């Protein structure tokens, strides 16, 4: 899996003084990891926002530091934003070992067309938006692709055990959980009963009797 690059620089201010670099269009960040001393760094805020949007929590990010000869492979671990204005306050990156398996939440992406879904009265049942995947960092898929064209009958159900990921990646969710199926939509038919206005008001209906003119002579 190809990573996304981001350039970082060492940070010289800490604590409440971080607001000074935020005013300059920079965001404080940290890199930490197993057996790694935490690094206090800073990033261009616009570039960092772009990286967050592209990488999410499941894409590798290649961190470039002026002091390093090699790039660092990291995942975005935590994003802190101002609760009122929403701007970035701080981001944590977790540096990984490429030889050790990692676990990540991978989004499900549906593509293709189902002949059933083109018809009225059918809908897609998809309980999950993400699945938990374990793999070596370079083998983590950016998405789990599901082709909707396979759902051509109502009997077609797709379970986690039916999904095979490339590169030795493994889905950790229970194998018998349903991932997708097409189901019929059962419409509720509402019946309207006509109510006599007199009955609705609680009054007894009055019988209308037509008087026929007598044809007999008196």
UniProtKB/Swiss-Prot annotation:
GO terms for molecular function: 5S rRNA binding; structural constituent of ribosome. Residues 197-218 are annotated as: Disordered. Gene3D superfamilies: Ribosomal protein L25, beta domain, Ribosomal Protein L25, Chain P. SUPFAM superfamilies: Ribosomal protein L25-like. One of its GO terms (cellular component) is cytosolic large ribosomal subunit. This is one of the proteins that binds to the 5S RNA in the ribosome where it forms part of the central protuberance. This is Large ribosomal subunit protein bL25. It comes from Dehalococcoides mccartyi (strain ATCC BAA-2100 / JCM 16839 / KCTC 5957 / BAV1).
């Amino acid at each position: 899996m190809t990573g996304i690059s981001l350039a970082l620089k060492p940070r010289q201010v800490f604590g409440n003084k971080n607001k000074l670099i935020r005013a300059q269009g920079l965001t404080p960040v940290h890199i930490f990891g197993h057996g790694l001393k935490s690094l206090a760094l800073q990033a261009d805020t616009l570039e960092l926002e772009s990286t967050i949007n592209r990488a999410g929590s499941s894409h590798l990010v290649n961190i470039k530091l002026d002091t390093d000869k090699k790039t660092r492979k990291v995942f975005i671990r935590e994003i802190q934003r101002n609760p009122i204005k929403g701007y970035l306050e701080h981001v944590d990156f977790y540096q990984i070992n490429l030889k050790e398996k990692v676990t990540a939440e991978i989004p499900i992406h549906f593509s293709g067309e189902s002949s059933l879904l083109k018809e009225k009265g059918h809908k897609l049942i998809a309980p999950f938006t993400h699945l938990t995947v374990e793999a070596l960092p370079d083998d983590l898929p950016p998405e789990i692709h599901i082709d909707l064209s396979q759902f051509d009958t109502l009997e077609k159900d797709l379970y986690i055990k039916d999904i095979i990921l490339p590169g030795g990646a493994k889905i950790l969710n229970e194998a018998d959980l349903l991932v997708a199926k097409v189901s019929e939509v059962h419409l509720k038919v509402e019946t309207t009963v006509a109510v006599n206005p007199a009955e609705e008001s609680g009054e007894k209906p009055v019988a209308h009797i037509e008087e026929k003119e007598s044809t007999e002579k008196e």
